[in-house]
Amino acid sequence: MYSKTLEIRGINEGEIISYLTDIGASPVAEDNTLFQGKNWTGRIDEVSFIRMFQSDIPQISLLFESTEEQTLNKVIEKFRRKTFRAGG
């Protein structure tokens, strides 16, 4: 089994759930913490907030797993494209 944990900051849980479904996953758990894709799973492990300049910034830990390394890499690439933010 191959796995990778990502820590995402600044994107709320609702958007993360939307991104997971956009890349082909369906919710498995009623509490929207476990998602199943084709030959892969994504799980929201932890949701917390960090305080910065009078704001609470969401910090979400996601665990992706697959039996195939190539599948895992493709899923993570798709997910990273969804979460990419360009600043100036």
Give residue spans per PLM region.
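Short, surface-exposed ligand-recognition loops at beta-strand->loop->(often short) alpha-helix junctions
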Residues: 6-12, 67-68
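Conserved mixed alpha/beta catalytic, RNA-binding, or beta-rich assembly cores of soluble enzyme
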Residues: 13, 19, 85-88
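Ser/Thr-rich, low-complexity intrinsically disordered terminal regions
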Residues: 2, 7, 17-52
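C-terminal basic regulatory modules in eukaryotic proteins
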Residues: 50-88
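Long, highly charged amphipathic alpha-helices
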Residues: 15-22, 74, 78
